[in-house]
Amino acid sequence: MTTTNQEPILKATHFRSEGDVNTTPAREKWNESLNDDATQAMLKRDSDVFLHQAMSTPCLDTLTAAEGIYIQDATGKKYMDFHGNNVHQLGYGHPHIINKVTQQMASLPFSPRRFTNETAVQCAEKLTQICGGDLNRVLFAPGGTSVIGMALKLARHVTNNFKVVSLWDSFHGASLDAISVGGEACFREGMGPLMAGVERIPPAVSYRGAFPLRDSLSLRGQNSGDANETACDVHYADYLEYVIEKEGGIGAFIAEAVRNTDVQVPSKAYWKRIREICDKHNVMLIIDDIPNGMGRSGEWFTHQAFDIEPDILCIGKGFGGGLVPIAAMITKDKYNTAAQVSLGHYTHEKSPIGCAAALATMEVIEQENLLEKVQADSAFVREQLLQMKEEYPVIGDIRGIGLLWGVELVTDHITKTRAFDEAEAVLYQCLNEGLSFKVSQGNVIQLSPPLIISRNELEVALSVFEKAIAKVCKDFEYL
């Protein structure tokens, strides 16, 4: 095969790492099925006015409304949103958040730099309270990518080292500094030289990792994604120390506590070893909890499920309650040493509206006991998905935490060959039946519902999903 022919194949593989590919024949067939004239007209207007980019063009459908766990298109069709770009922890249009933001807009809609305001201070105080431990210093920013940049700056300042270790297949945002430390080729494609001093190591992947697991997966149960004490993946952490010692000058290690897109859940032992290594070598541990924070794991923040504390925590997306973009970097008082450095300096740094939304989000999670609810829902989802795994041979692995689950489809359980076509077929079958989710790595179905979802809604969604899996198994002759 020539290099020319290889390039499209490589690009398709790269783009599958983050989400479902929107230029496949299956997507074209889906777009053709949208036979509403108003929908097609809107899609054309969108295509004519916006810059086209990978994974966003062409659009899947048009939306006119969103409420609770549902998004609604121009024809009135509703989708249960199990994707939501991870801003939908509390679903859409939560009345408490709308009320608090509306009140804030009427009194103080914006706070210029050099001034502070009661809402921002209250929000920061509440945030440090739920973080607990030594995470007691906060900076706000308009979005998650921005706080990643702030964290990298702070780590350089504190350690006086500019080098960073990250994980292959990681995603930390789409700005130049964020794609520099990210591990997905699709975002670096054609961008030329990026930020210097980035080393990458393999992530602790339980099902098809770069290194074999040292202990039998049976020790971790049928679900390869239990956040437990099993030490079968600790050698992935040991490789971090190898790189730190060989490379030298490492200032930070950045990672998600749980990889969001294809739901990779390391063991507690892995994260405890990472924490030990960072402490030993004076490397700052940056946890990117932008997609999973605010309760998705069943804890306020995902690292809390692993009994560790980072030096810097980055959050965003769902922090604004699905209403207002806001993100935060939380760190320790001992790192409050950058008074002469502009770590953020963002126009909307102490946004009263953003902080009102974030404060209301934290209040809803507490008032509605969503952390406890997520833990109960997690056990239910695990049981249902494991039953499907036993029945349908296309399912190779089930892994998850809280209300974040990955279902990996394979054509063969021995070779673990990725079932690309089958995963796409499941996606569009579910979309037809009103269930929306993303597909990562080309074959991992990510199920990420709003935390407010009722048990009945959860049962309906899983029923739709199972019927799609059953149909694909029949159509592709697995059964």
From Swiss-Prot:
PROSITE patterns: AA_TRANSFER_CLASS_3. The keyword Electron transport does not apply. Keywords: Lyase, Pyridoxal phosphate. Its EC number is 4.3.1.33. Its cofactor is pyridoxal 5'-phosphate. It holds the Pfam family Aminotran_3. The keyword Lyase applies. The modification N6-(pyridoxal phosphate)lysine is found at residue 317. It is an enzyme of class 4 (lyase). It catalyses: (1R)-(2-amino-1-hydroxyethyl)phosphonate = phosphonoacetaldehyde + NH4(+). One of its GO terms (molecular function) is 4-aminobutyrate:2-oxoglutarate transaminase activity. CDD domains: OAT_like (cd00610). Involved in phosphonate degradation. Functions as a lyase that catalyzes an elimination reaction on the naturally occurring compound (R)-1-hydroxy-2-aminoethylphosphonate ((R)-HAEP), releasing ammonia and generating phosphonoacetaldehyde (PAA), which can be then hydrolyzed by PhnX, encoded by an adjacent gene. Thus, catalyzes a reaction that serves to funnel (R)-HAEP into the hydrolytic pathway for aminoethylphosphonate (AEP, the most common biogenic phosphonate) degradation, expanding the scope and the usefulness of the pathway itself. Belongs to the class-III pyridoxal-phosphate-dependent aminotransferase family. Phosphonates represent an important source of bioavailable phosphorus, in particular in marine environments, where the bioavailability of phosphorus is often a limiting factor for bacterial growth. This is (R)-1-hydroxy-2-aminoethylphosphonate ammonia-lyase.
